[in-house]
Every structure is written in C-alpha cells, then in structure tokens.
Amino acid sequence: VTESYDDFINNAQTWGNGNMWQSDFKDSPSAQWEIKEVKRKLYRAVANVNILEGIRFYVSFACSFAFGELKLMEGSAKIISLIARDENQHLAITQNILNKWKAGDDPEMKQIMKEEEEWTYAMFDRAVNEEKRWADHLFRDGSMIGLNDALLKQYVEWIANRRMKAIGLKPVYDIAAKNNPLPWTQHWISSKGLQVAPQETEVESYVVGGIKQDVKKDTFSGFKL
C-alpha cells in the first residue's frame, strides 16, 4: 500500500513540477501519456487500499471474535469489532470510487482499470496468500475451539471472492458465496447483532452542568413533606 501511495505521490509531483499540464503542452501526445500514468498510479493506490481494508487483518479479526464467542477477552473482541466496522466503512468508500471509474465516470480511468485487471488479480492473490501464511503462523501449535488454520484459509478466500465481485471482478476461489465458513463472525462486524451492557461501555448520555444555579435562601420556604 505504501509503495503504491509513494509511486502515485512521486508521479503526481513530477507532473505538477513539470510543464506538461500547461495549456501550451497539455494536448500533446507526451502530456496525454504522462497524465494517464498519473491516473494509473492513482488507480493502483486506491485498489491497494481496497484490498487492505477488505482482506488484510481479517484472520486476526476472526481470532479475536473467536475468543469473544468463548466469553474470553470479550472487551478486546468488542474493541476489535469497532475497528473492523471502521475498516468496512473505508472499504465501502473505495468500492464506490472503483465502481464509479468502472462505470465510465472518467473514461480514461475505465480503460486503465481494464488494462490493470491482471495486476489487480495478482494483488488480491498476494493479500490472500499473506493472510493464509499468518493463519499458519497463529495456529502452528494447534487449534482452538471453533477455529483452526484450515477454516481461516477458507474464510479469507470467501472474503476475497466477495471483495472482487463488489468491484466488478470475477471471483477466482472455489468457495460458494453463500457458504461463509465462519458465519458467527458476522454479528461482530455488523452493529445490528451486538448488545453491550451499560456497565461495560462508556455512557455519553449523562447531563453535564445540569445544576440549577439560581437557587436562593427562600426557594424552598413553601416546601412541605
């Protein structure tokens, strides 16, 4: 992700510091090629963020939620669930951007997405394989109740298929869309299924500074029990 961002920033700065964007040159073949390369770097940066938010960390998320399902370290699991929901918000933003480009919001970006399809699949595959290796590392000494490395690997493939389909790519992993290997993770990621007791969370509904300030000595003179 940082490499893609660096490439885009450096490329954009080179474009901005040059003169190809000026009216005298912007319609020349060289200028058109340069601006397209800037857009290509932008696409790769956004696509990498999409993969980051949509696939990476999900092995760790699932492990944290598994402890929560066992009533162990529930506080940590609930905090991690908030992080996962935040990731989902970022994911939705990048999906919206990519789908706008794919629909022709910018015709040149639509062309770039088609040209970069092979690269995009390679980035998805790289992220999936790295998450699988992390699952192997976490469960190198054995499994836990309800979770093991094999299930996690299937889960990562299932998520990757969903992420690819969401941006108009064909899913490549052999796992049915309806067969979530870890269905119990959904209520941790979705705010609809999670209940939090008041004593376990920060309550923000208290009235602050609600004391009546104009009380005088005779205010309660007519008060009787």
What are these regions (language model features)?
Residues V1-L225:
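Non-heme di-metal
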